[in-house]
Amino acid sequence: EVQLQQSGPELVKPGASVKMSCKASGYTFTDYYMKWVKQSHGKSLEWIGDINPNNGGTSYNQKFKGKATLTVDKSSSTAYMQLNSLTSEDSAVYYCARDRYWYFDVWGAGTTVTVSS
């Protein structure tokens, strides 16, 4: 069974950073790009960026450049996203999704990030 297992919820203070994970199983990790998506309450999904697990190449939505950093660990079939300098605007659910030619065919359950002092 193809699965993406995301790390648990995070409660962080303004100005801090957070790093979440997305562990892939059931397929060859390096065969598919991994996308990251933000779902803010009451808003539509926003594409953050994607990473090629084969070579670590990344592409970012301009809005999230400097905010998000995407990395992978091929040895554990895990993708990571670090978010920096957090503010209340970063409170959201963040999803990883396997990219099949811009059709996101497998999704993680999401990681909830709450930024609060």
From Swiss-Prot:
Matching SMART domains: IG (SM00409), IGv (SM00406)
BP GO terms, sorted: immunoglobulin mediated immune response
UniProt cross-references to Pfam families, sorted A to Z: V-set
Cited InterPro entries: Ig-like_dom, Ig-like_dom_sf, Ig-like_fold, Ig_sub, Ig_V-set, IgHV
Disulfide bonds: C22-C96
This protein's GO CC annotations: extracellular region; immunoglobulin complex
Keyword set, alphabetical order: Adaptive immunity, Disulfide bond, Immunity, Immunoglobulin
Domain called Ig-like: residue spans: 1-116
CDD domains: IgV_H
Alphabetized Gene3D superfamilies for the sequence: Immunoglobulins
Molecular function in Gene Ontology: antigen binding
Top-level taxon in the UniProt lineage: Eukaryota
SUPFAM superfamilies linked: Immunoglobulin (SSF48726)
PANTHER family per the UniProt record, alphabetical: IMMUNOGLOBULIN HEAVY CHAIN
Other notes: The sequences of 10 hybridoma proteins that also bind dextran differ from that shown at 1-7 positions, many of which occur in the D and J segments. This protein binds dextran.
Name this polypeptide is given: Ig heavy chain V region J558
Organism (species): Mus musculus (Mouse)
Higher taxonomy: Eukaryota, Metazoa, Chordata, Craniata, Vertebrata
